[in-house]
Amino acid sequence: MGRDFSLKNTRNIGIMAHIDAGKTTTTERILYYTGRIHKIGETHEGASQMDWMEQEQDRGITITSAATTAEWKNHRVNIIDTPGHVDFTVEVERSLRVLDGAVTVLDAQSGVEPQTETVWRQATTYGVPRIVFVNKMDKIGANFDYAVSTLHDRLQANAAPIQLPIGAEDEFSAIIDLVTMKCFKYNNDLGTEIEEVEIPEDYRERAEEAREALIEAVAETNESLMEKIFDEQEITVDELKDAIRQATTDVEFYPVLCGTAFKNKGVQLMLDAVIDYLPSPLDVKPIVGHRADNPDEEVIAKADDDAEFAALAFKVMTDPYVGKLTFFRVYSGTLTSGSYVKNSTKGKRERVGRILQMHANSREEISSVYSGDIAAAVGLKDTGTGDTLCGEKNDIILESMEFPEPVIHLSVEPKSKADQDKMTQALVKLQEEDPTFKAHTDEETGQVIIGGMGELHLDIIVDRMKKEFNVEANVGAPMVSYRETFKTSAAVQGKFSRQSGGRGQYGDVHIEFTPNETGAGFEFENAIVGGVVPREYIPSVEQGLKDAMENGVLAGYPLIDVKAKLFDGSYHDVDSSEMAFKIAASLALKEAAKKCDPVILEPMMKVTIEMPEEYMGDIMGDVTARRGRVDGMEPRGNAQVVNAYVPLSEMFGYATSLRSNTQGRGTYTMYFDHYAEVPKSISEEIIKKNKGE
């Protein structure tokens, strides 16, 4: 059986936004109009079709990116719903990696919000073309022009409306399409009856001005359009559409649309814009990977059904009915169920038992997938997030995703022996699904420690253990993941020599330690000349340093951002061994700790707080009391926004404190930004606590 939709008629899109901008409702309406859902489910009633994990329905927020397939005007649209909460940035990152385009949903009253900025930045990093949907036009305080201005002011985006709303709040009744200069009026509550009418006289002038502005914004990226403007020639609808599509695909322009998903207005026109302006897999640059056996040799995965099969696994989930589901995006070639593939990242052969086309929480079994498709495979045992799957003859590894290390930890203790075994299984599965979630057993205390990107992240993990895996656990207080580093340089010697009858142990190294740039990690340089340390022992020196750095030099936290240059040493023909050089390296690090001025680093969070003006003084005082540094303030509508950097250790329980300081009218978001040195007094406390004093 051949493909149902050509590559040209395929769209892989994500829907991204700040929490509560109406993203899930928007996706829901898309599924309703494309005939995938017969009853509309409201997020605030906890019944949305995309939010299919229990936690998501309880909290009314989207956590996992469910992939859904829909059809519109003879096109296949694969939609990935991405979470808007900062603790789940990993979900956003991994979905952006496999998309060709995205719809950014804004709240018509708030415009660009803090999390919109974060997601927008991530999308820019991955070069994802976007259209913008200004949602909630029916809301009190909705202001389309203000929302568009925030795209310019806060994101410096070359964005211009391709639609204008007629009315706002309760009066929002129709939408003017500036490309075709037609007006669409909604006559019923479900938004299925749309009438094309003339643009009202009192809007005509404004619409013409907005169309001029649109043409100028697009012409900046298009020479032939610019020439037509200079020659004062008429620009046809098709020419304008083509120019908008080209500029959008090149990520040089962002068309802005309007509507209200909740009141069913503007969603079909937004679907039309997805088809008209967002790229098909053929329009985006082919993805470049490298050969598995030679990282320097580039290989291109071309969007072509006849090419060798290559796909990227971007999400792993445990499904109660079919077990492990691996979501993947096909970049080239085709795959049939029952066939074998190679996981080139891990060098393993895997069998694809079944292929499922996902629709939020129902599924349809299909026999084949083609280039450009997004589907889920059942039966892959060893494949994890970011792994490349390819044909058995192919040898490509696609660029994987990088995930941040956890910044917050807490201990979990099973309540009974039965819970113990279930918890071990649950933690293995949850780590498979979420690369930013880590679990390990503390060697000294025997406690299980879990780590993640924020309090909400770990709350939801514990919640899932209880609901999905029936694990009852006691949870400890959150702990901050501190780090250590050196502030000054020193050259030191590490010598290990042991003679106790028979064969001895001997290793001797001279290493120069210097501070590395923030975030650059550990760098090891071998500067040995003349074989004073034989080549076979060099990796042991590096490994010995890495192992010792894991346990730190001050308070047991990992040592980061340090350069180590091995420049001298000596060895013994008989007594030297890999182990002896490992120990010598760790002794050198101990010696360096005395001379290199080690310090403790703490995670600093970028915090954005929004509240009514009258609470400004209290909030600023509170930020300062938490050792925070205010980075700027700006008015947003009738509220004030404070941007600050605050240590994570001072942010526990902040939600409660903010609620009481603002009578429940303040909101905040925070995400990890960088590591910074801890003040001396606090550093001493941390060291004492860790030494059990």
From Swiss-Prot:
Entry GO terms, CC: cytoplasm
Keywords assigned by UniProt, alphabetized: Cytoplasm, Elongation factor, GTP-binding, Nucleotide-binding, Protein biosynthesis
Gene Ontology BP annotations: ribosome disassembly
Binding site for GTP: 17-24, 81-85, 135-138
Gene Ontology MF annotations: GTP binding; GTPase activity; translation elongation factor activity
Superkingdom: Bacteria
Protein name in UniProt: Elongation factor G
Originating organism: Staphylococcus intermedius
